[in-house]
């Protein structure tokens, strides 16, 4: 459980790497995917020093995200390079800065500063930024607790297909946080998130990752995981949604569940939601 909590935190910070790798043949990102961590540091630094915000973000993530071997993390430099990218308006770096402030690992925790950077990312339609604001208002971290605002942010991102926000929206309906309690809508939104990966596929992926962790060569620097943290976050969120469904089934009638399933189908059709491609 602790491992997956760490991965969820890292995935929010490093989520740009996988999507960027899909957009470009950048040697920097290719080296990360191939686990050539020290070479990646060299190549990413060259591009970062030339002002490339994507390379700056990747370099910052490497400096705090490489594990094992004799590599020593450099949190100060990690924050420096990511902030360089964020100050250029690169939304994924803005999100990374927000998460750094929220989690207090790379830099001291400062939820109020995190909110500023979440807002910058959200203003550029970064759904993780929108979700970050939802979480702050839901739990009163750095802001006065406001369930209605949290609900609005969850709904905004959920309607665009953001899985964590779909779960957050469902829980808001379940717990009557910012909206009138509605178990049918709660089940529908949790179901939408839960069905993005089927149970057998989820189990197979989790087993594969478990085997990789158990057979990891800890004498060598490791960074390949940074290229797929977004995928791992999606897996964890989907698994969490599936567990919530089991609880909801114990609290709802067959009639309510069938109504919720119908609603979920209508929402998916209207919003053109699709299953995750892993």
Task: Name each model-derived stretch.
Residues 207-208, 214-278:
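Terminal, low-structured helical/coil segments at or just beyond the last alpha-helical repeat
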Residues 17-50, 54-61:
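N-terminal leader/linker segments that initiate helical-solenoid repeat arrays
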Residues 27, 43, 58-67, 96-103, ...:
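Hydrophobic face of amphipathic alpha-helices that form TPR/SEL1-like repeat modules
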Residues 24, 36, 49-52, 66-69, ...:
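Short helix-capping/linker turns of helical repeat alpha-solenoids
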Residues 5-15:
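Bacterial N-terminal signal peptides
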């Amino acid at each position: 459980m602790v491992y997956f909590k760490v991965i969820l935190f890292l995935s929010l910070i490093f989520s740009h790497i996988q999507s960027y790798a899909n957009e470009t043949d950048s040697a920097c990102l290719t080296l990360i995917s191939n686990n050539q961590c020290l070479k990646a540091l060299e190549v990413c630094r060259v591009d970062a020093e030339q002002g490339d915000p994507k390379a700056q973000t990747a370099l910052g993530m490497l400096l705090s995200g490489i594990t094992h071997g004799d590599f020593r993390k450099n949190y100060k430099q990690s924050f420096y390079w990511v902030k360089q990218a964020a100050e250029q308006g690169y939304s994924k770096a803005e999100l990374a800065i927000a998460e750094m402030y929220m989690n207090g690992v790379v830099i001291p925790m400062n939820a109020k500063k995190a909110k500023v950077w979440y807002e910058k990312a959200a203003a550029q339609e970064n759904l993780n930024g929108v979700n970050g604001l939802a979480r702050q208002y839901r739990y009163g971290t750095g802001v006065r607790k406001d369930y209605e605002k949290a609900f609005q942010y969850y709904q905004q991102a959920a309607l665009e297909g953001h899985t964590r926000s779909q779960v957050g929206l469902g829980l808001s309906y379940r717990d009557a946080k910012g909206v009138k309690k509605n178990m049918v809508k709660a089940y529908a939104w949790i179901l939408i998130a839960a069905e993005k990966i089927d149970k057998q596929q989820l189990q197979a992926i989790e087993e594969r990752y478990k085997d990789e962790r158990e057979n990891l060569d800890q004498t060598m620097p490791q960074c390949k995981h940074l290229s797929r943290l977004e995928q791992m976050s999606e897996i964890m969120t989907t698994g969490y949604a599936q567990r919530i469904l089991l609880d909801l089934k114990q609290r709802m009638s067959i009639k309510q569940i069938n109504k919720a399933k119908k609603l979920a189908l209508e929402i998916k059709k209207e919003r053109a939601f699709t299953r995750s491609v892993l």
